[in-house]
A protein has these predicted regions:
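Sec-dependent bacterial lipoprotein signal peptides
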Residues: 1-23
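Cross-family detector of peptidyl-prolyl cis-trans isomerase
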Residues: 23-176
Length: 176
């Protein structure tokens, strides 16, 4: 009978030990999501919700524009505008301080705000739809803006305007 070498016997014993240990291991507990993964999934859910809300807002604003008698232009940022008083005045520039009258209403006509104040063009104090519209206006001109919530007061809203509110803005620039 042939004797196996010590190396072969150790190899066989080691293999048996590995097999035995492998069979007796306890199942690992299911790994809980990390805090970062939980935040990421909450963020993804919020983004999906906002995308649905934006799509509904686009449809609502588009329908409102179709039912109005004025001719509107769709801005690349997603809001509609129509110059209702066009004096062909020089366009306002970033940094210009202008007196203006803002009337804001929901798409159903419910008045939300009626504000007369002095604002600085491009200061970031105003929503995107208003800031971009100001750059296309001159003194004494008027524009109607139909703004979905994401170009108006967004997910935060204000004291007067609830979050996710689509609004119609009548914007009049004072002559002086």
């Amino acid at each position: 009978m042939r004797r196996l070498g010590i190396g072969y016997r150790l190899l066989v014993m080691g293999y048996g030990l590995v097999v035995m240990v492998g069979c007796t291991q306890q199942p690992q507990p299911v790994r809980r999501l990390s805090e970062k993964q939980e935040v990421d999934s909450a963020l993804m859910a919020q983004m999906a919700f906002n995308m649905q809300m934006a799509s509904a807002a686009d449809q609502a604003c588009s329908n409102w524009v179709k039912n109005d008698s004025a001719t509107y232009v769709l801005d690349e940022f997603g809001f509609w505008y129509s110059k209702t008083v066009n004096l062909y005045a020089d366009s306002l520039q970033a940094g210009d301080a202008v007196g203006m009258h803002l009337q804001m209403a929901e798409l159903n006509g419910q008045m939300l705000a009626d504000i007369e104040d002095i604002f600085t063009v491009g200061s970031g104090d105003l929503p995107v739809a208003i800031n971009r519209s100001l750059k296309q206006m001159g003194r004494g001109e008027q524009m109607r803006i139909v703004a979905p919530w994401y170009t108006a007061y967004g997910t935060e809203g204000t004291q007067l305007i609830k979050p996710y509110t689509n609004i119609v803005i009548t914007l009049t620039i004072n002559k002086e």
